[in-house]
Amino acid sequence: MRILRVPTDFRVVEQFDEAMLSRQGEHLVYSVSSRGLNTAESAARLADAAGVPMDSVSYAGQKPKEGVAGQVFSVHGGEPISMRGFEFVARRIGVADRPVQASDITGNAYEIVVRDLQGDDMRRLRHNMAQVRDGGLPSYFDDQR
């Protein structure tokens, strides 16, 4: 069995509570999809594009460089932006009167591709996935924790 053979074999997307969005605010809120970039690198791209210092960019959680990540950022001040490229897409989803923070994320959705299953792998995988479904799984990846 092989996991994470190619970058798109791992996807994680933050589940965002849109209740923090407001009708007015100084913080522009973006949905960002990145590939091959960690959270700090994505934040730097947003800061550069908006013309603001890095400390004007906030995010709820750390995402790894490996794989494809979907996460929410807020930018205090600066120019509204929209970016679309192979490894980075930023789309404004609203405004807020405060920066995005960890409590704005209700969880993460994962997609992990498993390749080259052999023998008893599928039976074990189904058994283990049932345990994950029933009990959850802590998220320990890269330098997050």
Model-derived regions, located:
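Extended, charged/glycine-rich binding lobes that contact polyanionic ligands
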Residues: 1-23, 27, 35-37, 49-50, ...
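Ser/Thr-Pro-rich, acidic low-complexity intrinsically disordered regions of eukaryotic RNA-binding
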Residues: 39-45
